[in-house]
Amino acid sequence: MGSLKWIVSVSAMASLIFLGLVILSGWGLSGAYVPSLTDGFPATLYLEKYSSGGHLLRSLHYYSSSGLVFSGFIFLSFFYISGFTAKYRKTWILCVLLYLLIIGSAFSGYVLPMDQNAYWGTKVRLSIMETVPLVGPVIADFLRGGATFNSATLPRFFTLHGSVLATTICLCLFLLIQTKKSIFIQYLSDQRFNVTLLVSIMLYFVLINNFSAPLELPADPTDVEYNPRPEWYFLWLFQFGKYVEWAPWIQSGVLPLLGVGFLFGVPWLRNHAQKRRSVIVIAWCLIWLVLTGLAVIDDKGLHHNPNYSDGMALHAEKNFNRLCIDCHGAGGLGDGPESQAFDLPTPNFTASDFWINTDEQRMIIIVRDGKGIDMPDFGESLTYEQILALVIHIKKSFKPNYKE
């Protein structure tokens, strides 16, 4: 029993730390985020690439959310195995409610980056929600602000994620702390605990800063071949849905209802022996692992969705072939068919002298504004990010002895 208490305590403390980091990083991100279909992705990209500390905030928010889902699951599992749910009913109910709110917050925040996975993943989730008998279509339309994605969709999800659910989570957390106030005071008054906590958070910051939160290309509603995939903790439900396509309401309604009903009813259920409670948790973990594993295996045969940098590089190559190759040639020698036909003074990208007399910013300006009567401007047809990716592609492909 001593080891169980230790796991419950550690997972509870880890969950609180992750939750605190999620809330604080979320506040930081909300200061620069614009909840609109046109500005949602540019705001996210600005945070990731140009804002001071934006990369760290996004990584902190994303990975702390995943850590919170995992540590919260560990806490609830071992709290249940310990057999204290009947004795501490109020604590258990608050913990379950808090965990469900966290899952809901993860769902509502998924669409905010407005990249490909966010857009298509949310469309799939809402279509699944619509299969819930009676209330499903009403809830889905309310979240979208209509029957389809529109200008009201992102503001609604942003308000739900950053205000409604965040406030409710803070309220539940406050009530939970009040029920165990003496335990928190005991921990916080322990100097060794405080030092360990501070060092752990600092190491976590250093580690997280080396990883980027996922970001794909901007949402493209016309890309019907895109394969959205949920977060790792929803993969099992996604896979389960494949086996009940004949009755999707089982995935969207019956299964969640049974799961939530069981969690809230645990304190009033017959208190089985610890061994039986352990078997129930292990069985659920095995089901989760099998379904998640099957989902990962099925995904191996699907088209890989590139991240933002890789996707922009692919688009840059296509843009070069579409816009530049007729003049500059496939090898960047300036010997394209139009250059030869009209005797145009096209630069040779493979010559060292060209790169001595130019730089990245100058090339961006030329591509954007054009040069003379022969070089057209592409400022209206390409975004700044697309122009930058095109210039980088030219440097990587043709500059002699190029090094990043």
PLM regions and their residue ranges:
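Extracytoplasmic electron-transfer domains, predominantly the class I c-type cytochrome c fold
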Residues: T148, A341-K399
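Membrane-embedded alpha-helical bundles that constitute the cytochrome b-like, heme-associated redox core
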Residues: M1-F240, Q251-W284, W288, T292-K300
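Interfacial "cap-and-anchor" motif at the non-cytosolic start of specific transmembrane alpha-helices
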Residues: V244-A247
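Short cysteine/histidine-rich zinc-coordinating motifs and their immediately flanking basic loops
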Residues: I185, P337-A341
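C-terminal capping alpha-helices of c-type cytochrome domains
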Residues: L173-Q178, V260-L269, L291, I373, ...
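Electrostatic cytochrome c docking/interface patches
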Residues: I297-N321
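The canonical Cys-X-X-Cys-His
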Residues: A316, F320-G331, M375, L390-I394
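Short glycine/serine- and acidic-residue-enriched loop/turn motifs that recur at repeat junctions
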Residues: G332-G336
